[in-house]
């Protein structure tokens, strides 16, 4: 509901809802110095994984700020990780495997068994990792 309230009033987002440049640089440093990562959790997704089929119809996407998605795209491209999970788009989706890595979009209607997610194989589906 909050999203539609904001959109009706032409309010896109508030500055403190996103990382600032200093915080983004901290993330880049973590990627360079602390990899590999077993699991990445983020609110939104890396840009290449944006589910365009879930975008709001009638909303000019050129007016939508994609700073965080582009930043996470940079992180994802440069990061050694096994699994990545995000929400934001209010849907459940298990993306196709890429280089032994798995991307998962979650909504609050399902609970994923973290152990099953971390140990899943390419032959398994979303239903196999539900708690």
Segments the model singles out, each with a brief description of its role:
Residues 62-63, 73-78, 89-131:
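Binuclear metal-dependent phosphoesterase catalytic core
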Residues 39-43, 85-86, 105-106:
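A structural signal for short, well-ordered beta-strand segments and their strand-loop junctions
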Residues 3-4, 46-51, 75, 81-96:
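Active-site environment of divalent metal-dependent phosphoester hydrolases
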Residues 1-66:
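Active-site-proximal loop/helix segment associated with metal-binding centers of metalloenzymes
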Residues 35, 79-80:
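Alpha-helical hydrophobic/aromatic positions enriched in membrane-embedded helices and signal peptides
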